[in-house]
Amino acid sequence: MSSASMFGSLKTNAVDESQLKARIGVLALQGAFIEHINIMNSIDGVISFPVKTAKDCENIDGLIIPGGESTTIGKLINIDEKLRDRLEHLVDQGLPIWGTCAGMILLSKKSRGGKFPDPYLLRAMDIEVTRNYFGPQTMSFTTDITVTESMQFEATEPLHSFSATFIRAPVASTILSDDINVLATIVHEGNKEIVAVEQGPFLGTSFHPELTADNRWHEWWVKERVLPLKEKKD
C-alpha cells in the first residue's frame, strides 16, 4: 500500500478519565495508520493515537502495526534506536500487539518473497510469512474469510464470516511452533491459506480489517485481548 491514507482525516475520541478503558497506540511511520486510529476511537472507552517515537509508547495498553510497506517501516524502525529498543521492550513485556499485513510480517520470525529482504523484524511470533503471496497490488481482492469459533464475534451476522481486503498480502506459510493459534483461513486456488494467527499477546492478520465497515476485529481485540491483560496488571 502507499503511505497515503485511504479514508479521510484523523479523528479523536474525547473520553472522560473515569470512563477510559484502554489507550491504543498505532505505529504511524508509514501505511494505513489513520484508518486504525479512527476505528479505535469509535469504540467506547478507547483512546487511540499515532506512535512515532519511543516517548509515544509510554502508558499504552496495546499497539497496532498497520499495513504499508514492511521494508520501509522496518528501515524507519531500525534507524531510530530509541524507538526500536522501546518496541522490542514492549514485545518482551508481552504488550498486546496486533500487526496487519505489513505489521504481520514485522511480527514474524522469518519472511520470504518480495523484491527486497526485510531489513528488520520484531520476531515476536513463531511463523514464517510469504510476502506478496497473492500477487501485486493490481491483484488485490476482497473475499469472505472463515474465522474459528474462538473468535467470539458478536452482533453482526453471519457470526463466523468476515469480509476481508487483501492488498499485496502475506500468508503464514509455515507455523514454527505449537504456540501458534490459527484464527482464520481462506481457500485460494484450491489451497487453504492461513491469514490470521495469534501467539500469546500477539495477533497477526494478513488482510486489512481497517478498510471495511465491519469493526468486529478491532472490537474483539480490545475486549478479548487488550482489556483482560490490562485488568491483570491493574
UniProtKB/Swiss-Prot annotation:
Q: What class of enzyme is it?
A: hydrolase
What superkingdom heads the lineage? Eukaryota
Q: Which residues form the active site?
A: 101, 208, 210
Subcellular compartments: Cytoplasm
From the UniProt record, give one GO term of the biological process aspect.
pyridoxal phosphate biosynthetic process
SUPFAM superfamilies reported for this sequence: Class I glutamine amidotransferase-like
Q: Which GO terms describe its cellular component?
A: cytoplasm; cytosol; glutaminase complex
Major place of residence: cytoplasm
Q: Where does the record locate the signal sequence feature? A: none
Q: What is this protein called?
A: Uncharacterized glutaminase C222.08c
Q: Which organism is it from?
A: Schizosaccharomyces pombe (strain 972 / ATCC 24843)
